[in-house]
From Swiss-Prot:
This is Thymidylate kinase. GO terms for cellular component: cytosol. Belongs to the thymidylate kinase family. Phosphorylation of dTMP to form dTDP in both de novo and salvage pathways of dTTP synthesis. Pfam families: Thymidylate_kin. It comes from Vesicomyosocius okutanii subsp. Calyptogena okutanii (strain HA). Disulfide bonds: none annotated. Keywords: ATP-binding, Kinase, Nucleotide biosynthesis, Nucleotide-binding, Transferase.
Length: 205
């Protein structure tokens, strides 16, 4: 059986990931491809419990190293118990965020050591990597405007614009480091134009 493809989608808050995830799932379904939709942090029973801790406003003062370690603990469980088994079955996996988010949010946003994140990545992922990463890019001001109407913001969404500018800069830097895998998508365009950019990438897989 042919191994499935692993697609990740990432970007700052308000980039429009949820809308494009719906499109990707619909597009692949029309191609008779079975898609396992998942997310990080989360994706497993244990991962979802860790996600709740990470996003709760009650843990707003969590130490940055603790945050990073919890994310990679959830990621280890996610990869080994959900992602790899699905790929081995021949399913495609679409994950809302993956390791690039750790470099952007914990590395760029929090200012944690990139070398430390890389060590955790090597330990948990080894040589495992997405086939393609769709990086939705929007100016932070536009992203914040898009999420302004959300009734309740989580612990991360409550961060400052300066934080998210650092996150965005880190994402763009990652896309330049890994241009073959990370496809930078201008998500400030219209929904139709953004979707078309993604469609072209999917057709090449």
């Amino acid at each position: 059986m042919q191994r499935g493809k692993f697609i990740t989608i990432d970007g700052v808050e308000g980039a429009g990931k949820s809308t494009q995830i719906d499109f990707i799932c619909s597009y692949l379904a029309k191609k008779n491809i079975n898609v396992v939709l998942t997310r990080e942090p989360g994706g497993t029973k244990l991962g979802e419990k860790i996600r709740a801790l990470l996003l709760s406003i009650d843990t707003q003062l969590m130490d940055n190293d603790t945050e990073l370690l919890l994310i990679f603990a959830a990621r280890n469980e996610h990869i080994k118990t959900k992602i790899i088994p699905a790929l081995n079955r021949g399913d495609w996996v679409l994950s809302d965020r993956f390791t690039d988010a750790s470099y952007a949010y914990q590395g760029g946003g929090r200012g944690l050591s990139i070398e430390r994140i890389a060590l955790l990545e090597q330990w948990v992922l080894q040589d495992f990597s997405p086939d393609v990463t769709l990086l939705l890019d929007v100016p932070v001001a536009l992203g914040m405007l898009r999420i302004k109407s959300r009734s309740r913001k989580d612990r991360i969404e409550l961060e400052t614009n300066d934080f998210f500018n650092r996150v965005r800069d880190s994402y763009i830097k990652r896309s330049k480091q890994f241009p073959e895998r990370i496809k930078l998508i201008d998500a400030s365009q219209t929904l139709k134009e953004t979707t078309q950019q993604i469609k072209v990438i999917l057709q090449a897989l």
